[in-house]
Swiss-Prot record:
Belongs to the OspC family. It comes from Shigella flexneri. Interacts with host calmodulin (CALM1, CALM2 and/or CALM3); specifically interacts with the apo form of calmodulin, preventing calcium-binding. One of its GO terms (cellular component) is host cell cytoplasm. Coiled coil: none annotated. The gene is ospC1. It catalyses: L-arginyl-[protein] + NAD(+) = ADP-riboxanated L-argininyl-[protein] + nicotinamide + NH4(+) + H(+). It is an enzyme of class 4 (lyase). This is Arginine ADP-riboxanase OspC1. Pfam families: Shigella_OspC (PF06128). ANK repeats lie at residues 363-392, 399-431, 438-467. The record marks H138, F183, F206, D226 as: Important for catalytic activity. Its EC number is 4.3.99.-. The active site is at E320.
Length: 470
């Protein structure tokens, strides 16, 4: 078996273990080692080829881990009876990637059988989509790049203890478990207009910066919608209203769930190789069902421009592309779509933008307040370490509903930030709230939220409570 076959074998671990055993047997018999008389240095091409084989292997291994987590833990896959068993040890099997390929083929076969045979105009549209180039758009308020773009999955961010705003929620993790993937919007790219063509995904503005890559991943997967929330929003939420003004009936038809034959949670999923074919076939299925004749004629027009094709695809669907674990590349483009607000910079821990905007103490106090209300411990400590904040400054911070003491002791608030405020005399541990929960104090909050660390901290600094029910 050659190196390439060995690295890509599903039994790679067995091969490695077997080799280890042979080496252990051999080592005691070795009495001396010397260089051969002639030693050929590997040329640059061989070194590069070897490096690419190793990189490809590690990329596949990481993808196997991400897919194994998704297909074994996501409750929706279990409900559909398409889940796989979790690995028996820490090593994920390449079978998880093979499972993706089988599911992709299943959804392609399902829609192909439904549509057979295709008309000439349908074949023309399908060919147009398959032969189109795609770009993938990730939006964020974070500063994700210098010379290299680095985007990490929510799971990797958590594992590294990075503090940032989350766009992954409990139900995503419970039902889909795709939190070890990086998410991208999908656009048609072979046109002369400036990228990105779209700045929202499923009605959501995910950030002021668009990071665009024009290369896919051999182990990525695509869904026609958000993988968890597979409902296409009503037409008035869509971004390009001037395009939609051309049509009437289809605007009433577009809001729907996109799913396979097993019900709403049966979300079609395609590997990278099949994704354009899947996108084209499902689009044809929608067009066939539509009663909007003008929309049909527009879609099947012989001179359909790439931008118009993108408008159609991101109206009928809103495709989402997913790359396992992490994207790290020098081949990207960063586009500033709009300005970033101070609150967005704070919640994204975007220190470059924070430093641009926080030019005096007044703005620093705003940033401090935003970091406390959004429970951004890292940014709060950063502001406190770079500005001399006084008790009078803290008193000047106003909130319509909450006292600063309440916010410092609210659910999931930072003990480090609270202790800094206490040590510097910026708050008194026994100050009673005047607004929400009037008459209570920080210790009452800590006890109510069962925050043992905060209770211990407040008692250490002499906190008391008059609440007889505690």
């Amino acid at each position: 078996m050659n190196i390439s076959e060995t690295l890509n074998s599903a039994n790679t671990q067995c091969n490695i273990d077997s080799m280890d055993n042979r080496l252990h047997t051999l080592f005691p018999k070795v009495t001396s080692v010397r260089n051969a008389a002639q030693q050929t240095m590997p040329d640059e091409k061989n070194l590069k080829d070897s490096a690419n084989i190793i990189k490809s292997f590690f990329r596949k291994t990481i993808a196997a881990q991400s897919y194994s987590r998704m297909f074994s833990q996501g409750s929706n896959f279990k409900s559909l009876n398409i889940a796989i068993d979790a690995p028996s040890d820490a090593k994920a099997s390449f079978k998880a990637i093979e499972h993706l390929d089988r599911l992709s083929k299943h959804y392609i076969s399902e829609i192909r059988e439904k549509l057979h045979p295709l008309s000439a105009e349908e074949l023309n549209l399908l060919s147009l989509i398959i032969n189109s180039d795609l770009i993938f758009r990730h939006q964020s308020n974070s500063d994700l790049s210098d010379k290299i773009l680095n985007i990490k999955s929510f799971n990797k961010i958590q594992s590294e203890g990075i503090c940032t705003k989350r766009n992954t929620y409990a139900d995503d993790i419970k039902k889909i478990a795709n939190h070890d993937f990086v998410f991208f919007g999908v656009e048609i790219s072979n046109h002369q207009k400036k990228h990105p063509l779209n700045t929202k995904h499923h009605t959501v503005d995910f950030g002021a910066n668009a990071y665009i890559i024009d290369h896919d991943s051999p182990y990525g997967y695509m869904t026609l919608t958000d993988h968890f929330d597979n409902a296409i929003p009503p037409v008035f939420y869509h971004e390009h209203q001037s395009f939609l003004d051309k049509f009437s009936e289809v605007n009433k038809e577009v809001s729907r769930y996109v799913h396979g034959s097993k019900g709403i949670i049966d979300v079609p999923i395609f590997n990278t190789k099949d994704m354009k074919l899947g996108l084209g076939l499902y689009l044809i299925d929608f067009i066939r069902k539509s009663e909007d004749q003008s929309f049909k004629e527009f879609c099947y027009g012989k001179n359909l421009a790439p931008v118009d094709l993108d408008r159609i695809i991101n109206f009928v669907f809103q495709p989402e592309y997913h790359i396992p674990r992490m994207v790290s590349t020098e081949n990207f483009k960063k586009v500033k779509i709009r300005e970033i607000s101070l609150e967005e910079a704070v919640t994204a821990s975007n220190y470059e933008e924070i430093n641009k905007q926080v030019t005096n103490k007044k703005i620093a106090l705003q940033a401090l307040f935003l970091s406390i209300t959004n429970q951004k411990e890292d940014v709060a400590l950063y502001i406190l370490s770079n500005f001399e904040i006084t008790r009078q400054d803290v008193i000047s911070i106003k909130h319509e509903l909450y006292d600063i003491e309440y916010l410092l002791s609210a659910h999931n608030s930072s003990c480090k930030v609270l202790e800094y405020f206490i040590n510097k005399g910026l708050v008194d541990v026994n100050t009673k709230f005047k607004k929400t929960n009037s008459g209570d104090c920080m210790l009452d909050n800590a006890i109510k939220y069962e925050n043992a660390e905060m209770i211990k901290l407040l008692l250490k600094y002499g906190a008391t409570s008059d609440n007889k029910y505690i």
